[in-house]
Amino acid sequence: MINLRRFVHTSCRLERGRTAFYNVHQKVTDPAKQDPDYFEKKARELPLDQNYIDALTKLYYEKIGSERDLGLKAADNLILEKTEFGLPRIEKSKTRAKYEDLDVLSNAPESVKKIFSVEMATRKELSQEWKQSLIKSVRQHSLDENSLEMKIAWLTALIRHWSLLVNDIGQETKKKPTWLTHRIWLVINERRKALRILRERNETAFEKTIAALKISYHVPKQPAHVKTRKAWAEAQLKLRVENEKEKRLEELHEKYDKEVEEHKRETQEKRKALNNELDKLAQEMRQIDVIEGKSFETVGKYEPALISSLTETVIHSNLFYHPPPTMTEK
């Protein structure tokens, strides 16, 4: 009879998955993570102990899980700004843009003006007000409708308005509105392209635009950067080893310079002490020679009789000097 136990597994043991699980929907709450080199800097600060590889793996999982949320919010600093989402403040009593040219409203009562004000505007009309406010801050002139600055401002208002809408929806339900986040991704990529073109064409206008719109622009990395956890961990470990090596070499160099300066100072002090001792011994030897009569201690300095010797030299020249034949007068 065939034994069925050979073909049926009755164990309830759970095997580990073949692929690692990454929670790519992590919510980022730390504004410091908006820096594109944040995780690389944190990897360099990890202590080099027996838990270094585990800490590096945990940091990599956090990096992968934060990329999606950072991609949606980092460029506009929306992690730090959660109240207004970078949108300009508009006075509630202000007349809506499409009714500003109506002369009838200038003499209308306050109750009528309130109906046409921003306070009574719909979400769509409020979005138009935000767009107009951002566009006015960067466009070149009043008739500017096709410049890159105007396009970037319009896309920025759209991104921030939709991000605010995603936040409002998230407070009512846990299900993420992917139909809206996908559109935000497309608009972000379109704005990134416009920023790159503006930066290549006019650096001054580019700096003015990102300053007026408060956009954090970072030059994108090359597509050859590492993707897998193992490659990223190895790259961070190599950078850490190089940094530690340079740091250690710098410390040894500073220590060597201090030791050299200390050795020079000690050598000069010893040389000075030996020279003083040598001068003292030489002075004692001279005193002994004076006592024994081998030498005499001179007082003052001898000066020869310059005038008398000069006169004697001139007289001898006149008496005994004979010039060579070539110098005689013909």
Curated annotation (Swiss-Prot):
Q: What is its main location?
A: mitochondrion
Q: What do the Gene Ontology cellular component annotations say?
A: mitochondrial small ribosomal subunit
Q: Which GO terms describe its molecular function?
A: structural constituent of ribosome
Tell me the domain of life. Answer: Eukaryota
InterPro entries for the chain:
uS15_NS1_RNA-bd_sf, uS15_ribosomal
Question: What keywords are assigned to this protein?
Answer: Mitochondrion, Ribonucleoprotein, Ribosomal protein, Transit peptide
PANTHER family, alphabetized? 28S RIBOSOMAL PROTEIN S15, MITOCHONDRIAL (PTHR46685), SMALL RIBOSOMAL SUBUNIT PROTEIN US15M (PTHR46685:SF1)
Please state which protein family the record places this protein in: Belongs to the universal ribosomal protein uS15 family.
Name recorded for this polypeptide: Small ribosomal subunit protein uS15m
Q: Which organism is it from?
A: Caenorhabditis elegans
Q: Which gene encodes it?
A: mrps-15
